[in-house]
Regions:
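Intrinsically disordered, low-complexity regulatory regions
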Residues: 1-97
Length: 97
């Protein structure tokens, strides 16, 4: 007997997760590009590995902020706020200054 999920089961589960999250956040993931273009109009600067680590963690904070903004009119989204706090602490650890 195999308890591992099959590919179709995994895909159905993923679709269910997408639908649940989309009800909460909407299509906010489609806004990230426009927002990042405003923040980085000249593109990203060259970075070493440490810089890319900082950018990667900052991008996680950014993603949670975008998700939180999608729920701002409904009182916010505690999970996104909590996750952003954790990522911000990770970013502080990586900050040189």
């Amino acid at each position: 007997m195999n308890d591992k999920p099959t590919v179709p089961e995994i895909l159905r589960s993923g679709a269910q997760t997408y639908e649940e999250r989309n009800r909460i956040y909407g299509d906010n993931y489609k806004q990230a590009g426009a927002l990042l273009k405003v923040l980085f109009p000249d593109g990203l600067p060259p970075m070493d590995a440490d810089g890319w680590n900082r950018f990667g963690v900052w991008l996680m904070v950014f993603g949670k902020a975008v998700r939180y903004a999608a729920q701002l009119q409904n009182g916010g989204h505690k999970d996104s706020a909590h996750d952003a706090m954790v990522y911000a602490a990770m970013l502080e650890e990586l900050t040189d200054e």
